[in-house]
């Protein structure tokens, strides 16, 4: 949903009303990291202030940030990230300020067929699998919308959710 609208032409605010939302030169940064509201008076200032307020506006830059971070995180685990381009695209548009991190899951799951593990990882949780020499590792890479502050809590929460998903997958694999 549209919550506010910035509309400028030659540094002047355009008078636009869209479904009761009036245009202005006031916008906001990242919901948790940026300023609540700030004024912009030009396109250049818009990009500059959003960047300072933890919003990477350029989707191509955001996508490359995610790609590069995921590759580096996987390397730190001694593996390679399985970068599904459709998933990468989806995550790019789910976050404003991406920070990739890794999580772990029980090694018993890597004995299952790869798709049984990677499907809930990718389809339900939006995680990237990590492999080494074509074999799945008991790790995943997730992308947080924010900085690395308290990433340990974010990691623990993501691991907990994936454990439940994988337990379900294991159950259905054995039942079917």
Residue ranges and their predicted role:
Residues 1-176:
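Amphipathic alpha-helical "coupling" segments that flank catalytic cores
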């Amino acid at each position: 949903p549209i919550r506010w609208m910035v509309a400028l032409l030659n540094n002047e605010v355009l008078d636009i009303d869209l479904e009761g939302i009036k245009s202005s030169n006031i916008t906001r940064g990242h919901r948790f990291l940026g300023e609540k509201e700030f004024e912009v008076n030009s396109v250049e200032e818009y990009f500059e202030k959003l960047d300072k307020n933890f919003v990477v506006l350029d989707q191509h830059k955001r996508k490359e940030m995610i790609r590069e971070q995921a590759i580096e995180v996987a390397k730190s685990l001694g593996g390679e990230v399985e970068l599904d381009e459709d998933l990468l695209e989806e995550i790019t548009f789910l976050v404003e300020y991406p920070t990739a991190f890794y999580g772990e899951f029980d090694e018993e799951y890597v004995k299952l067929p790869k798709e049984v593990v990677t499907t809930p990882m990718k389809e339900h949780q939006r995680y990237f699998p990590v492999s080494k020499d074509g074999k799945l590792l008991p790790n995943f890479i997730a992308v947080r919308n924010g900085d690395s502050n308290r990433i340990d809590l974010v990691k623990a929460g993501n691991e907990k959710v994936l454990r439940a998903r994988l337990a379900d997958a294991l159950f259905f694999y054995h039942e079917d």
